[in-house]
A protein has these predicted regions:
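Hydrophobic/aromatic-rich alpha-helical bundle segments in the mid-to-C-terminal region
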Residues: 5, 124-128, 132, 146-195, ...
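Amphipathic alpha-helical segments used for helix-helix packing
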Residues: 100-128
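Hydrophobic core segments within long, regular secondary-structure runs in both alpha-
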Residues: 84-91, 135, 139, 185-196
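Short, flexible helix-adjacent loops and helix caps
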Residues: 25-29, 74-81, 99, 143-150, ...
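Helix-turn-helix
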Residues: 11, 15, 19-64
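Solvent-exposed, amphipathic alpha-helical segments
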Residues: 19-26, 72-76, 109, 113, ...
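Hydrophobic alpha-helical connector segments
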Residues: 60, 74-107, 154-164, 188
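Hydrophobic/aromatic residues within well-ordered alpha-helical segments
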Residues: 12, 54, 61, 65, ...
């Protein structure tokens, strides 16, 4: 069956994103548009036509990528659920994702993406915007939860989300690299230790 124009465009976008992931994963900041286009079976002109340029393709690639330490798949908690319970579930999920056999390869890809972004200020700016958007999604898990007899606000949830992501990313990378053999209990208790007024800030 012949593809419609929209279907063909979507298929070409998918091919370029997957090709970019492979080339960036292998070459990092040395990744070339020509290599990406060739692997996708397209031309560099297609990249400019579909994405506007290399940086927009790279951002699309990162947005499409599901990190082994990404928590967006966790459904938002029911309003009023104890914050400690939600944070505990996040920590457990983080540990399971970090212990996944594919996590090492995905961590290497993330390192290549950082190499790419740190060598391109424009791309770095776009990736930072994407990171901030992801933080807001993550914070939605905690907003509306109950803590200390009050409801966690959006601002408090965002502060906690940033602190948790930093803490659990570090612990998770240790698991991926085999540097630590930590228990679920340790992950949970360490994560819950961040639930303080000083971290959450004012309501």
């Amino acid at each position: 069956m012949r593809l419609t124009r929209a279907e063909s465009k979507a298929a070409n976008k998918r091919a370029l994103i997957e090709a970019a992931r492979e080339v960036v994963g292998r070459e990092g900041s040395k990744a070339k548009l020509e290599d990406i286009a060739e692997l996708a079976g397209l031309t560099t002109g297609a990249i400019y036509s579909l994405f506007g340029g290399k940086n927009d393709l790279m951002v699309a690639m990162v947005d499409d990528y599901t990190s082994p330490l990404d928590l967006r798949s966790i459904e938002a908690a029911e309003p009023g659920m104890p914050l400690e319970e939600v944070v505990a579930e996040v920590a457990r999920r983080f540990l399971r994702m970090s212990a996944d056999p594919q996590a090492a390869g995905k961590l290497l890809f993330e390192t290549r993406v950082l190499d790419l972004a740190l060598n391109d200020p424009e791309l770095l700016g776009k990736l930072n915007a994407s990171i901030r958007s992801t933080e807001v999604d993550f914070a939605a898990l905690f907003s509306g939860c109950e803590y200390g007899g009050a409801t966690v606000t959006d601002g408090q949830a965002l502060r906690l989300a940033r602190a948790l992501k930093a803490l659990l990313s570090g612990l998770g990378q240790g698991v991926v690299l085999g540097a630590h053999d930590v228990s679920e209990e340790f992950f949970v208790e360490t994560a819950q230790a961040l639930i303080t007024r000083r971290v959450l800030g004012l309501a």
